């Protein structure tokens, strides 16, 4: 291939054992080549970009010093692990990253023994690594080291503090590396972010560290007895200052740093020096997200996952969206601002996703009425509940897959009290290339059993706006609105804000042979499949948009149950426990026995690929729906006695 870069060192590194054959003086060149390889690959094969550039030196140093995969490295979130993948046998396959059948977007033990723990969500690395350290000790593997790499805002998550609290009371050989780049996807927020900044810039603490280091350096001139005495004095001085200014030392976790996270030789030296120190330790690195690529260093949020770009000029290759429908996320943002201008009780809450979910629109217009609470989904829900309890009306926007982490908070802190909290579940359904950790396919199944909770899903942008308007009306109680990532279907998306009666669906099309019941935007695919099937086979299909999973539109379902012997339910969620199950339960409870085919996500974790590819694999695309409808045409004349509810 023309202009293909040549790497004098990286080309010879297939696994970390090859890296460890180099001298420490060669590591900076390895880092430069690895960084350029990441830039080259991601310029044409989009993925998480800036985070991986920021940890190139750390990644190289870790695999150079530690005996991976025997030694364990646990990456928090994992979107910074592209360099790790390239160095661990996947460089040739890296062009398939995030593609159907290719390597996975996040570390996965099923893919490589170097990927020690599944990741994708934040703040779990310390707990997982501590568990591995305990396992190593119990098995007598005294020479096995365990490292947790946490950063990108993950220290704001409660689970990280739970892991620290547990680690502080153990003597296990655990190293926690704090990758401090002041960023999640957006800029980090909260007290921990400010604390780390103060810790990095504290003159008093840094001066004390310098003086203690200088004393210890000179101890080679002293006899053994006096050397030990000065070591004890230095440790005492460090302990005294640390207890006053360092939360980690105060928790009995030895603290080292902060150090330059882009000096690979120094990182390797320090890792080597502290590797065999027993007990929990923290090494604090200060890094720059997007390091080595100017545009990413300047605008890390945009370059978190920028899409395609020119690797030389840094110009992003953005598709022309003129005349296209808007993103559901932007419709949410604009509508929230519109509602908040009229309803002074409305507040906005998001856990570290203001730009991703478009909560930043409200933050920009009314900064005192919107909160980024950091990576803290449980807190976001309970915080919203507290505001609702005293008269405010929070719109709590959390990605569907991340809302799983706040399940008890929804039940205990909102639903039991019937509090007026609007949960906007962004990224509902199959999200595509980010894979099983990010698909929002479980929400309908796990929310449906919760009493007092209204669950809705709009088919299009107009429905989203009207559901948001409905949810903020008085005394609606907990109200969930789920909608997908990406573009809607209406170019003219603005519409009057009107109430939708809670629990009322709608008949989109009449028919006599078969009833199709859908919920959410997948109804658009169903409508096209129905039109094709009717034209090809003559079948007469009625189409109902359920709108609300809870409460169900019982009047609509009685109409369907009385009229139709064949029903197809279609949803963009897990088939176990979802909308199809709700229809089955209703029909059985009310003495209707139609034949029901359910279309949805099967009972398995769906891998990564484009949304269109994944819909096809699950039989949820237009062609899959068409096949189910036309197959039902063959059974239209079956006797009533043979019709039974079927699971599919």
Curated annotation (Swiss-Prot):
The reaction(s) this protein catalyses: D-glyceraldehyde 3-phosphate + pyruvate + H(+) = 1-deoxy-D-xylulose 5-phosphate + CO2
Documented EC number(s): 2.2.1.7
Cellular component, GO annotation: cytosol
Pathway connected to this protein: Metabolic intermediate biosynthesis; 1-deoxy-D-xylulose 5-phosphate biosynthesis; 1-deoxy-D-xylulose 5-phosphate from D-glyceraldehyde 3-phosphate and pyruvate: step 1/1
InterPro entries: Dxylulose-5-P_synthase, THDP-binding, Transketo_C/PFOR_II, Transketolase-like_Pyr-bd, Transketolase_BS, Transketolase_C
Record-listed Mg(2+) binding positions: 152, 181
GO molecular function term, any single one: 1-deoxy-D-xylulose-5-phosphate synthase activity
Cofactors demanded by this protein: Mg(2+); thiamine diphosphate
One GO BP: terpenoid biosynthetic process
Record has Metal-binding as a keyword: yes
Cofactor binding note of this UniProt entry: Binds 1 Mg(2+) ion per subunit.
Summary of subunit composition and partner proteins: Homodimer.
Family membership noted in the UniProt record: Belongs to the transketolase family. DXPS subfamily.
Name recorded for this polypeptide: 1-deoxy-D-xylulose-5-phosphate synthase
Source organism of the structure: Bacteroides fragilis (strain ATCC 25285 / DSM 2151 / CCUG 4856 / JCM 11019 / LMG 10263 / NCTC 9343 / Onslow / VPI 2553 / EN-2)
Record gene name: dxs
């Amino acid at each position: 291939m023309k202009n293909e870069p040549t790497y004098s060192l990286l080309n010879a590194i297939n696994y970390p054992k090859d890296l460890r054959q180099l001298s420490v003086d060669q590591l900076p060149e390895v880092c430069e080549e690895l960084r350029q390889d990441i830039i080259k690959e991601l310029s044409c094969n989009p993925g998480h970009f800036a985070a991986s550039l920021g940890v190139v030196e750390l990644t190289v140093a870790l695999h150079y010093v530690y005996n991976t995969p025997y030694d364990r490295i646990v990456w928090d979130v994992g979107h910074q692990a592209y360099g790790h993948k390239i160095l661990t046998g996947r460089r040739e396959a890296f062009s398939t990253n995030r593609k159907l059948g290719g390597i996975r977007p996040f570390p996965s033990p099923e893919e490589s023994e170097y990927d020690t723990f599944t990741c994708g969500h934040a703040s779990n690395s310390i707990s997982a690594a501590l568990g591995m350290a305990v396992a190593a000790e119990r098995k007598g593997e005294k020479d096995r080291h365990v490292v947790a790499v946490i950063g990108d805002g993950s220290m704001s998550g409660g689970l990280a503090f739970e892991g620290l609290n547990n680690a502080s009371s153990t003597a296990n050989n655990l190293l926690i590396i704090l990758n401090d780049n002041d960023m999640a996807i957006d800029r980090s927020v909260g007290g921990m972010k400010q604390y780390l900044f103060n810790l990095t810039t504290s003159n008093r603490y840094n001066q004390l560290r310098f003086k203690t280091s200088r004393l210890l350096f000179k101890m080679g001139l002293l006899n053994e007895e006096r050397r030990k005495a000065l070591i004890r004095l230095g440790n005492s001085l460090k302990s005294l200052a640390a207890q006053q200014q360092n939360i980690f030392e105060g928790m009995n976790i030895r603290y080292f740093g902060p150090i330059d996270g882009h000096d690979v030789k120094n990182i390797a030296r320090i890792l080597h020096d502290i590797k065999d120190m027993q007990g929990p330790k923290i090494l604090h690195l200060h890094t720059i997200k997007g390091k080595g690529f100017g545009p990413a260093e300047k605008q890390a949020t945009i370059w978190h996952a920028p899409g395609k770009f020119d690797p030389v000029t840094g110009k992003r290759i953005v598709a022309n969206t003129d005349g296209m429908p808007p993103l559901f996320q932007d419709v949410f943002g604009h509508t929230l601002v519109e509602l908040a201008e009229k309803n002074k009780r409305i507040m906005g809450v998001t856990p570290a996703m203001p730009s991703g979910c478009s909560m930043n629109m409200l933050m920009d217009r009314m900064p005192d009425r919107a909160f980024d609470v950091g990576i803290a989904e449980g807190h976001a829900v309970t915080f919203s509940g507290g505001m609702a309890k005293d008269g405010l009306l929070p719109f709590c926007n959390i990605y569907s897959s991340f809302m799983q982490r706040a399940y008890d908070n929804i039940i205990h802190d909102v639903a039991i009290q019937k509090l007026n909290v609007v949960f906007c579940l962004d990224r509902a359904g199959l999200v595509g290339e980010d894979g099983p950790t990010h698909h929002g396919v479980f929400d309908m199944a796990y929310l449906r059993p919760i009493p007092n909770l209204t669950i809705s899903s709009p088919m299009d942008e107009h429905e989203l706006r009207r559901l948001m308007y409905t949810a903020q009306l008085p005394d609606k109680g907990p109200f969930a609105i789920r909608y997908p990532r990406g573009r809607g279907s209406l170019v003219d998306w603005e519409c009057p804000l009107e109430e939708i009666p809670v629990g009322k669906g709608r008949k989109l099309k009449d028919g006599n042979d078969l009833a199709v019941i859908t919920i959410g935007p997948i109804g658009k695919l169903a409508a096209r499949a129905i039109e094709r099937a009717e034209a090809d086979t003559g079948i007469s299909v009625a189409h109902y948009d359920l709108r609300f999973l809870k409460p169900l539109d019982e009047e609509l379902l009685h109409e369907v149950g009385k009229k139709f012997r064949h029903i197809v339910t279609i949803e963009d969620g897990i088939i176990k426990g979802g909308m199809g199950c709700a229809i089955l339960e209703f029909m059985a409870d009310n003495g209707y026995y139609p034949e029901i085919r359910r279309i949805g996500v099967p009972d398995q974790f769906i891998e990564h690929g484009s949304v269109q590819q994944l819909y096809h694999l699950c039989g949820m695309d237009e062609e899959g729906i068409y096949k189910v409808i036309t197959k039902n045409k063959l059974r239209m004349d079956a006797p009533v006695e043979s019709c039974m509810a079927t699971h599919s």
